[in-house]
């Protein structure tokens, strides 16, 4: 049985899980073995087994803002989950652990530290999460997607994204020959964003019919009917879907995206080369989505529109002032931020640490 065994630790959100899956693919393509440490009753428990990866789980949930009882139980829970993680590491003879963030990352990383197993961490956001901040003290390598997430030199690798997104043609090639209305993609994540679903149709209704962009709007789970009804009631044409299964084509065909500013979204926008109107989720931990958005805005790859300032009138004003030339410039600037070999860079760093 050749190859080394790596334990990936990631959970809670797609922003942690999908970059880790990209690294898992890279490790396996090099002949190594991968197991996954996640939380019980979690998103990763539903997603990871679909990729033919062995999933081990711990009974742990977050503690930030989750009540006094859970915080009082934390020392006992941490002791128990660290012991369980140690058993998992021993059972599978793990030679290196890679932490991507989420509640499960800390006990898994602490277990590795106590057993003398090398730790690599990868931070997806512009503001490092709590688990990764703690583990960075013990990590053999600290890798990150945004320049100021950590001060460790040589760790900037970007966020792993799917190769088919990175392999899209450059913006100038995609935009060539486009005429007529702008085509705008609206995505609020898999669950949708109610504020975008409400405000975007209202903003379009304020524009003259001949100035309205062509819209492709992902509603999010369970929200398609109400979104389509809002567009219809306002007399605005839009193509609405509950969930976009082919994001590669959606990115390829769009001139601009209206979206949140999660780490995975920013990574995909830069990999594809697409400008965006970014409306950060205001309740994200440490307001990391605003920091993520600033990364693109500082490169003149889009606009940051705080949710508190998002009104139909403001959005209509912005959309009315856009043209394809500006969208192309934003798209080209976004593409310059891409680090397309991120998954391989993380995998190679971990392999070196396990040597």
Swiss-Prot record:
Keywords: Cell cycle, Cell division, Cell inner membrane, Cell membrane, Cell shape, Cell wall biogenesis/degradation, Glycosyltransferase, Membrane, Peptidoglycan synthesis, Transferase. Its EC number is 2.4.1.227. One of its GO terms (cellular component) is plasma membrane. GO terms for molecular function: UDP-N-acetyl-D-glucosamine:N-acetylmuramoyl-L-alanyl-D-glutamyl-meso-2,6-diaminopimelyl-D-alanyl-D-alanine-diphosphoundecaprenol 4-beta-N-acetylglucosaminlytransferase activity; undecaprenyldiphospho-muramoylpentapeptide beta-N-acetylglucosaminyltransferase activity. The keyword Lipid metabolism does not apply. It comes from the Bacteria. Pathway: Cell wall biogenesis; peptidoglycan biosynthesis. It catalyses: di-trans,octa-cis-undecaprenyl diphospho-N-acetyl-alpha-D-muramoyl-L-alanyl-D-glutamyl-meso-2,6-diaminopimeloyl-D-alanyl-D-alanine + UDP-N-acetyl-alpha-D-glucosamine = di-trans,octa-cis-undecaprenyl diphospho-[N-acetyl-alpha-D-glucosaminyl-(1->4)]-N-acetyl-alpha-D-muramoyl-L-alanyl-D-glutamyl-meso-2,6-diaminopimeloyl-D-alanyl-D-alanine + UDP + H(+). One of its GO terms (biological process) is peptidoglycan biosynthetic process. It is a peripheral membrane protein. It is an enzyme of class 2 (transferase). It is found in: Cell inner membrane. Its main location: membrane. UDP-N-acetyl-alpha-D-glucosamine binds at residues 13-15, 125, 162, 190, 244, 289. HAMAP family: MurG. Belongs to the glycosyltransferase 28 family. MurG subfamily. Cell wall formation. Catalyzes the transfer of a GlcNAc subunit on undecaprenyl-pyrophosphoryl-MurNAc-pentapeptide (lipid intermediate I) to form undecaprenyl-pyrophosphoryl-MurNAc-(pentapeptide)GlcNAc (lipid intermediate II). This is UDP-N-acetylglucosamine--N-acetylmuramyl-(pentapeptide) pyrophosphoryl-undecaprenol N-acetylglucosamine transferase. It comes from Neisseria meningitidis serogroup A / serotype 4A (strain DSM 15465 / Z2491). The gene is murG.
């Amino acid at each position: 049985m050749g190859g080394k065994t790596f334990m990936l630790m990631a959970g809670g959100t797609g922003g942690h899980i999908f970059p880790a899956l990209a690294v898992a693919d890279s490790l396996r393509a090099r002949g190594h073995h991968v197991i996954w440490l996640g939380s019980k009753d979690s998103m990763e428990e539903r997603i990871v087994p679909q990729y033919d990866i062995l999933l081990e789980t711990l009974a742990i949930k977050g503690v930030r803002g989750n009540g006094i009882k859970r915080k009082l139980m934390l020392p006992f829970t941490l002791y128990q989950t660290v012991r369980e993680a140690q058993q998992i590491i021993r059972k599978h003879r793990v030679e290196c652990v890679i932490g991507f963030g989420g509640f499960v990352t800390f006990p898994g990383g602490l277990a590795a530290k106590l057993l003398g197993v090398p730790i690599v961490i990868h931070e997806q956001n512009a503001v490092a999460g709590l688990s990764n901040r703690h583990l960075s003290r013990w990590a053999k390598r600290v890798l990150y997607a945004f320049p100021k997430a950590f001060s460790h030199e040589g760790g900037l690798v970007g966020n792993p994204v799917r190769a088919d997104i990175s392999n899209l043609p450059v913006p100038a090639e995609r935009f060539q020959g486009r005429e007529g209305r702008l085509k705008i993609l609206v995505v609020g994540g898999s669950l949708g964003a109610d504020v975008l679903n409400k405000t975007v149709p209202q903003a379009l209704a304020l524009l003259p019919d001949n100035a309205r962009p062509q819209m492709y709007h992902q509603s999010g789970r369970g929200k398609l009917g109400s979104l389509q009804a809002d567009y219809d009631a306002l007399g605005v044409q839009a193509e609405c879907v509950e969930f976009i299964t082919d994001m590669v084509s959606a990115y390829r065909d769009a001139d601009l995206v209206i979206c949140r500013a999660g780490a995975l979204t920013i990574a995909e926008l830069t990999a594809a080369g697409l400008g965006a109107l970014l409306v950060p989720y205001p309740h994200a931990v440490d307001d990391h989505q605003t920091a993520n958005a600033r990364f693109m805005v500082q490169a003149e790859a889009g606009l940051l529109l705080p949710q508190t300032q998002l009104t139909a009138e403001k959005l209509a004003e912005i959309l009315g002032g856009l043209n394809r030339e500006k969208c192309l410039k934003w798209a080209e600037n976004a593409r310059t931020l891409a680090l397309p070999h991120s998954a391989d860079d993380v995998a190679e760093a971990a392999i070196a640490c396990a040597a």
